[in-house]
Amino acid sequence: LLEDRGVLKVGQNLKYDMLVLKRYGVRLTPLDDTMLMSYALDGGKGGHGMDDLAQRHLGHTCISFKQVIAHAPGKKAADKSFAGVPIDKAAEYAAEDADVTLRLWMILKARLVAEHMVTVYETLERRLVPVIVDMEHAGIRVERSVLARLSATFAQRAAEYEDTVYELAGKQFNLGSPRQLGELLFDDLKLPGGKKTKSGQWETRANLLDDLAANPDLPEDARRLIETMLQWRQLTKLRSTYTDALPGHIHPDTGRIHTSYSLAATTTGRLASTDPNLQNIPIRTKEGREIRTAFIAEKGNKLISADYSQIELRVLAHMADIPQLRQAFDDGL
């Protein structure tokens, strides 16, 4: 039935269900996904989860997962599991899920036809689902040893930067504390350009520190302190976000990272990657490019990188027919 091409399967965020079924060799087809139908129709109008859609189109408040899981045994939320939810409560939750999905499908399907969006949904959004399922299932291979080596290197360099900051500051303080850094720069050293937040704390955002370091009237030691502080921040961020965090996402059975791609999270049609986000691995810095070397192909294969250059602006230039913008692209600017 699940693979019968003569029977349409309707669901909400079917990518999740398809991934589970794929592990058991089942290929769900054909399908309609109410989340993607809503996204094709109302891409910039808020969330496309079932709770949001049920409220928006049906005026209905769905049973929340928190409510149903509360029926499971265990004193703390961390101790509770859906497997422990009584059958009658689980059945009510699942039945509502199916009922709401079908009612949403009838509303959204009619809108797709009325608003001439069937082609966009069927040829762009829906066709991408099985592709994304295969991508998530396959994952990407990551070399633990590369991440471990980079983590150690970054830690050593960060420690050196820390010592330099202490020397230039004339005292030790918590480099990870924006409050202590702000007090050092603007209270102790009396540097210009300081701004305070509503809570009365000095701002120490990276762009503010960049502007401060670019001040030609700044004493050289103060400039070096700020620049070294920014380098320390960069390295500690790379360690905590990538070299130390990514190994925890490597699946013990596959040895690969299986990120989750959302097809309905952006207003521009781009995918969003979470758990972990593999779309924001740095590339403009030397350290970022080193982190990228940890992502490797299986033996006998190669990784290929392909990207459109300024695709959104190019589409805008074409659709809006802006001569100056089109000329800028023609001139390679």
Give the location of each predicted region:
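Conserved RNase H-like, two-metal-ion catalytic cores of nucleic-acid enzymes
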Residues: 1-57, 139, 155, 284, ...
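Solvent-exposed alpha-helices and their adjacent loops that cap or buttress functional pockets
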Residues: 2, 295-296
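Structural motif
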Residues: 8, 302-303
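Conserved "right-hand" nucleotidyltransferase catalytic core of DNA-directed polymerases
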Residues: 14, 27-29, 45, 53, ...
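Short C-terminal domain-edge/linker segments immediately following a structured domain
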Residues: 39-43, 61-62, 290-293, 333
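Short, contiguous acidic/charged loop-to-helix segments that flank catalytic cores in large enzymes
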Residues: 41, 249, 325-329
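Metal-dependent catalytic core segments for phosphate chemistry
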Residues: 51, 305, 312-333
